[in-house]
Amino acid sequence: MNILYWSLFTVVVYCYAGLPLIAVINGLAKPRKVKRTDFPPGLTIIVAAYNEEQQIQHKIDNTFASNYPSEKIQLIIASDGSTDQTSSIVNYNTDPRIVFLNLPRKGKNATLNSAVKHAAHEILVFTDADVSIDANALSQLASHFSEADVGCVAGNFQYIGAGNDGESTHWNIDRWAKKRLSRSGSITSATGALYAIRKSLFRNIPDGVTDDFYISTLASRQKKRILFDENAISFGNGVNSTGDEFTRKVRIAVAGLKGVWHQRKVCNPMEFGMFAVQLFTHKVARRLGAIPIIIQFFVLSAIANTSPVYMALFVLQLVFHLLALTGFLLRNRKAGQCKIFALPYFIDMVLWSGLVALYHLILSTRMDLWVPDRNT
C-alpha cells in the first residue's frame, strides 16, 4: 500500500506541478531571439458572433481604435444564426473594411471555417465579441511574424470585474508559465480572447473541439512556434454564476480532450520533443488528474493510522476539501472570494469538471451548440 500511495502521489504531483516545472527548466535555457519588424503585415480580424447586440458595436469601434494602420485591417464578423439585432447593427456600419457574414446556426467552429474563406490577408487574428483589445495589441501580435519559424502568437488576456480569486490565481500562474515557455521554445496553445496565426497554416476546425486550441496547435503541427506576448493585452469579464462556470469548464474539457485526439500527432515526443510532453502534461494529465487524486485519497485513508506522516497528509487533504466546500457554500458572498476558500474551491471545481467531461466522452454525449459566456 505504501508503494501504491507514493506512486499515486507522484502522478498527482506530475499532473499539477509538471507544467510549471517544465516552464522553470525551459526558462533556464538561452532565449531565442525574435527579430521584430516595423513593417506591418495585413491583418484579417475574425469575430464569431451569436446574439451579440449588446456588444458588437463596441467590438467594431474598439477594433478600429487600434493604432495599427487602418488600411491594413480587414474585420470579418460572422453571425452564427443570431436571432437578435446583431445583423442590423453590423449592417448599419458602412466601413468597407467590414465583411459581414449572416450564416445559419451551425456552431462556432463551422462559423470560423466559413469566415476564413473570406480573409484577404495572410495573418488571421481571432478574437471574441465580448473582448476589448488594447490599442497596441495588434501591433504587438503582428511584429513577431517577421520570423519564419513563428506560426502563432497568443495575446495576454486579463479579467476585469467579475471572476473569483481562484480563477485569477490560475490565470496568473498560466501567464507566468507562458512567459517562460515562450522565451526559448513554444507555449502549448493560445487562449481564444486574442491570438494570431498565419493563414497558410489554417485548416478547417472539426466539430466538437475547442477552436483556440485546435487552431493554435496547427502551428506546432507544422513545426512552427507558438509565442506569448504579454504586451498584446485583451480584457474581458469572468462568469459570475457557479453553475454556468462549471458547465463551461466541462464543455471546454470535453472539447479540449477531443482536440488533443485530433492533434494527437503532436503528442509524439520522438517527433515533437519537449512540446509533446508539455502538451500531454497541460491538456491531458491536468484534466484527468482527479482520477489519481481520488484513488490516492482512499489509499491514504486506509494507511493513515500506520504513520504520523500519513495521518498528517490525510488531515491536510481533508482540510483542503473542507475549504473547497466552504468556498462553494460561500460562493455568492464576499467571504467566499477570499483566496483561502476561493482557490481550493476553484481547484476542486476543475477536478470535478474533468471527471464529468470524461463521463461525457465515454458516453459520446453531444454537447449543446456554442453559446457565448456572458457576465450578466
Model-derived features: where do they sit?
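Long helical/loop segments within the catalytic core of UDP-sugar-dependent glycosyltransferases
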Residues: 104, 109-111, 127, 135-209, ...
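Catalytic donor/gating beta->alpha subdomain of glycosyltransferases that bind UDP-sugars
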Residues: 95, 145-154, 158-174, 207, ...
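Short, acidic, metal-binding catalytic loop of nucleotide-sugar glycosyltransferases
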Residues: 61-72
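Short aromatic/hydrophobic "clamp" motif used to bind/position activated sugar donors
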Residues: 124
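Acidic helix N-cap motif at the loop->helix transition within catalytic regions
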Residues: 54-58, 72, 83-92, 136
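N-terminal membrane-anchoring/stem segments of glycan-assembly enzymes
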Residues: 1-37
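Membrane-embedded multi-pass helical conduit in multi-pass membrane proteins
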Residues: 3, 37, 236, 286-366
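A conserved acidic beta->alpha catalytic loop
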Residues: 62, 79-87, 104-106, 131
